[in-house]
């Protein structure tokens, strides 16, 4: 299954590099957050906090979900890239 097939059910997607730059965006995330370093650094900061918690409990971090009344952000870190999708 290709990335476009996987992402078709989401309202938008974003790829953040390790340095905080946004390398790609689509859908509502492109409209709202593309080139927004503050959004990217907030996501990275949240991941650092989660990593501290999971490391202290010997748990492996896989995915973080942040839910609001109108939308849900799903954040996944794989290698040096951070993928964000919104439902």
UniProtKB/Swiss-Prot annotation:
Q: What is the lineage of its organism?
A: Eukaryota, Amoebozoa, Evosea, Eumycetozoa, Dictyostelia
> Which family is this sequence assigned to?
Belongs to the LAMTOR4 family.
Keyword tags:
Lysosome
InterPro entries found in the cross-reference section: LAMTOR4
Subunit composition?
Answer: Part of the Ragulator complex.
What is the top-level taxon of the source organism? Eukaryota
Summary of the function given for this chain in its UniProt record:
Regulator of the TOR pathway, a signaling cascade that promotes cell growth in response to growth factors, energy levels, and amino acids. As part of the Ragulator complex, may activate the TOR signaling cascade in response to amino acids.
Cell compartments where the protein resides: Lysosome
Q: What is its main location?
A: other
Instruction: Tell me what this protein is called.
Output: Ragulator complex protein LAMTOR4 homolog
Task: Please give the positions of the paired cysteines in each disulfide bond.
Answer: none
Q: List, in alphabetical order, the GO biological process terms annotated in this UniProt record.
A: cellular response to amino acid stimulus; positive regulation of TOR signaling; protein localization to lysosome; regulation of cell size
GO cellular component terms given for this protein: lysosome; Ragulator complex
Which species does the entry assign this protein to? Dictyostelium discoideum (Social amoeba)
